[in-house]
Swiss-Prot record:
GO cellular component: cytoplasmic vesicle; membrane
Extracellular side: 30-141
Keywords: Glycoprotein, Membrane, Signal, Transmembrane, Transmembrane helix
InterPro entries in alphabetical order: CD164_MGC24
Recorded name of the encoding gene: CD164L2
PANTHER family associated with the record: CD164 SIALOMUCIN-LIKE 2 PROTEIN, MUCIN/PORIMIN
Transmembrane parts of this sequence: 142-162
Sequence similarity: Belongs to the CD164 family.
Residues bearing attached sugar chains per UniProt: 71, 103
Protein name (record): CD164 sialomucin-like 2 protein
Keyword Transmembrane helix (UniProt): yes
Signal sequence extent: 1-29
Topology, Cytoplasmic side: 163-174
Length: 174
């Protein structure tokens, strides 16, 4: 078998660099978050950040249905006392004890009430506290990223090597 040419090596190197850069971006974005999820995607601007935008909606129906111009879909209406009008918050925000949460327009306080759509009253004592994660270098994540990049490079190398070997078996008739 032939040694891989400069084109195959260049392709493997570029693929490895792209994987390394992506892993570095995800590691930086996920720092302080519990695992890789919506928090990391918000920091990378892949997922719309709705927490600040929910507060701008002042009507319950607009809040729970979402505003198409702002791409909102995870807002709920929170009302703590009957005399207060309530406000729109993101579902992920901490809810005060004793507040009613409305997630359908039929259940909004100003709208007509349907007996099957009762608001959910939150009676939890304290919100869950995320695990403490000290900022800094995480050796296990670094080793995992290196193993991931090297394995992807090896797969790309062997796939290109296999395709190159298949092409070299064909001979012209003339």
């Amino acid at each position: 078998m032939e040694a891989p040419g400069p084109r195959a090596l260049r392709t493997a190197l570029c693929g490895g660099c792209c994987c390394l850069l992506l892993c570095a971006q995800l590691a930086v974005a996920g720092k302080g978050a519990r695992g890789f999820g919506r928090g990391a995607l918000i920091r990378l601007n892949i997922w719309p950040a709705v927490q600040g935008a929910c507060k701008q909606l002042e009507v319950c129906e607009h809040c729970v249905e979402g505003d198409g111009a702002r791409n909102l879909s995870s807002c709920v209406w929170e009302q703590c006392r009957p005399e207060e009008p309530g406000h729109c918050v993101a579902q992920s925000e901490v809810v005060k004890e004793g507040c009613s949460i409305y997630n359908r327009s039929e259940a909004c306080p100003a709208a007509h009430h349907h007996p099957t759509y009762e608001p959910k009253t939150v009676t939890t004592g304290s919100p869950p506290v995320p695990e403490a994660h000290s900022p800094g270098f995480d050796g296990a994540s670094f080793i995992g990223g290196v193993v991931l990049v090297l394995s992807l490079q090896a797969v790309a190398f062997f796939v290109l090597h296999f395709l190159k070997a298949k092409d070299s078996t064909y001979q012209t008739l003339i």
